């Protein structure tokens, strides 16, 4: 009798859990639908289109032509993104370190208030600001000429790779700093105080105590910045008029003027691969750090 009652109870438990599971699926369904329709489906279509010709046959011609026609643009994109990430990392570490270890309260409050402003400015507005600021007769050169720091004949345009690097850094530094400063603020203050009592200065505390513990947040911010810089179209379209340029501008050019989705998706495939490799390296480093911890 006891055995039969326990069997009946064990069979009744899943039936009681079914409504709860169904309710959970209903709550998650809108998010899953958005991911499938807005990310997974376009990704699958772009991958298929990159390897199929107009007749529907499988081919690698689109990838080969993309590398032959836009190889310089691919290298240019990788170079600009790499320099931008290095600049973003350096500035973000400096700002975050001062926010956490700074000894002047009013300067810390002022910096905390100022550095976040570019977060609320869209990329298209950022591109227009940079175009007006970095041009030959832009605000930067006019200020340098008026203050006597540069002759008017020496003014030059920064609407090239340098302008792209400065614009990307100006836009993404606040985002990375926000993540990194939060991670640094979560570090146990006793570690910092122990290092200071042992004679370490603030710079050494930053690079040997605080930054190693906050490094995962820095990597996350840089990877997300990489994705943002590889996907933005407005900034390279506004700042660079010739070649080479960013891959997003070439993809838009290929679709707008030629209707060639095959080569455009092949260029997008290279962006996917670059982002995936970067994310894979981050995951490997994270797993190795957790294994040795």
Language model features by range: what are they?
Residues 1-20:
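Short, Lys/Arg-rich, polar N-terminal cytosolic tail immediately upstream
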Residues 20-52, 69-153, 159-185, 213, ...:
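Membrane-water interface segments at the C-terminal ends of transmembrane alpha-helices
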Residues 52-56, 233-261:
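Glycine-rich helix-loop "coupling/hinge" segments at transmembrane-helix boundaries
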Residues 58-67:
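A short amphipathic helical element positioned immediately N-terminal to and/or at the very start
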Residues 115, 192-193:
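Short alpha-helical segment that forms part of, or immediately flanks, the ligand-binding pocket
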Residues 187-191, 290-291:
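Short glycine/proline-centered loop/turn elements that form peptide/ligand docking sites
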Residues 198-200, 212:
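Glycine/proline-centered hinge or cleavage motifs at structural transition points of membrane proteins
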Residues 285-293:
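Short cytosolic juxtamembrane segments of multi-pass membrane proteins
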């Amino acid at each position: 009798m006891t055995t039969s009652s326990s069997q009946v109870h064990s069979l009744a438990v899943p039936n009681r859990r079914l409504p709860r599971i169904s309710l959970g699926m209903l709550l998650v369904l809108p998010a899953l639908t958005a991911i499938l329709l807005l990310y997974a489906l376009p990704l699958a279509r772009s991958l298929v289109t990159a390897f199929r010709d107009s007749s529907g046959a499988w081919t690698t011609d689109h990838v080969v032509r993309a590398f032959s026609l836009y190889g310089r643009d691919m290298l240019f994109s990788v170079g600009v993104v790499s320099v931008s990430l290095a600049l973003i990392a350096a500035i973000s570490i400096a700002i975050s370190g001062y926010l956490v270890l700074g000894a002047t309260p009013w300067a810390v409050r002022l910096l905390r208030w100022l550095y976040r402003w570019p977060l609320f400015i869209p990329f298209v507005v950022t591109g227009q600001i940079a175009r007006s600021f970095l041009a030959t007769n832009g605000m930067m050169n006019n200020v340098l000429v008026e203050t006597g720091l540069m002759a008017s004949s020496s003014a030059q345009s920064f609407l090239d790779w340098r302008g792209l690097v400065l614009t990307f850094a100006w836009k993404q530094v606040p985002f990375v700093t926000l993540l990194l400063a939060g991670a640094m603020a979560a570090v146990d203050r006793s570690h910092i105080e122990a290092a200071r009592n042992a004679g370490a200065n603030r710079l050494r505390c930053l690079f040997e105590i605080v930054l190693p513990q906050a490094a995962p947040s820095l990597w996350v911010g840089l990877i997300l910045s990489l994705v943002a810089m590889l996907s933005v179209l407005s900034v390279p379209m506004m700042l660079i008029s010739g070649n080479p340029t960013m891959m997003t501008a070439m993809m838009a050019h290929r679709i707008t003027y030629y209707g060639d989705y095959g080569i455009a998706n092949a260029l997008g495939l290279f962006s996917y691969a670059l982002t995936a490799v970067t994310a894979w390296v981050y995951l490997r480093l994270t797993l190795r750090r957790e294994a040795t911890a």
